[in-house]
Amino acid sequence: MATRSPYKRQTKRSMIQSLPASSSASSRRRFISRKRFAMMIPLALLSGAVFLFFMPFNSWGQSSGSSLDLSHRINEIEVVAEFPHDPDAFTQGLLYAGNDTLFESTGLYGKSSVRKVDLRTGKVEILEKMDNTYFGEGLTLLGERLFQVAWLTNTGFTYDLRNLSKVKPFKHHMKDGWGLATDGKALFGSDGTSTLYRMDPQTMKVTDKHIVRYNGREVRYLNELEYINNEVWANVWQSDCIARISPKDGSLLGWILLSKLSRGLLKSGHRGIDVLNGIAWDSDKQRLFVTGKLWPKLYQIKLKQASAKSGNYIEQQCLV
């Protein structure tokens, strides 16, 4: 820290002492007050600069419980390629495992499953059905084990990556089981609320959790999850939106708007489709894949900057 200059202290003292002797006490007080006020201005500016410098970046521009202005981080999409997808698959979890191989979990009572799928053909190579009492939900891969959660229960299951045989069930501590993802160490989970959970994969105990908000409003119905470039991406149920979330503190980092996909399917006559759900990431080739429940297609997409009107769309369509 810089030391104060004795020259500046002496100059200020000299200016005060140089007041005429005939000046009244009130004049001297007014002069001193003006000088004190003048000195307070640069001090206040300096204090403000120091405060801003040490503030966490993700709290700039936001009040308690609100989010940053994300207008520069709202993306729409372009379709790079289309692939066949089982139109009877009620997709709940999706992941890419290399060599053009996908793993997918499906839902609905009596139809829930975990499956290994060929990306190019959409062919189901291995299928493991769940007990009819379970409604399959999110899926992720950690090491050689697939982890899956189920709807309306705290029970989940692990599967052997090679043949999809069940290894053992587990109990988690989320309110419900919706989505799962991993960074290779921890598991991230969603339960249909606005909460993003971090869990220990050995014990399934919750080690951290955060409420996700946008402009002060909770982003509810976080569904299928994927870990992409140090972010957790979440489908928002009943919408064509993906929320980009910081796994460190739950702050909202951006939005991806994908309504053109469902519109295109409906326009081409696929009236039986359900909502967008399913994100898969090929980290080696930087390829991004998405699909939906009962969708006949799976898409490879890339992001592009959204139009200026997208902010209104988020308020109306993403915050369901």
Curated annotation (Swiss-Prot):
One of its GO terms (cellular component) is plasma membrane. It is a single-pass type II membrane protein. The chain crosses the membrane at residues 37-57. One of its GO terms (molecular function) is glutaminyl-peptide cyclotransferase activity. Residues 1-36 are cytoplasmic. Keywords: Acyltransferase, Endoplasmic reticulum, Glycoprotein, Membrane, Signal-anchor, Transferase, Transmembrane, Transmembrane helix. Signal peptide: none annotated. Its main location: endoplasmic reticulum. Glycans are attached at residues 99, 163. InterPro entries: QCT (IPR007788), Quino_amine_DH_bsu (IPR011044). This is Glutaminyl-peptide cyclotransferase. It comes from Arabidopsis thaliana (Mouse-ear cress).
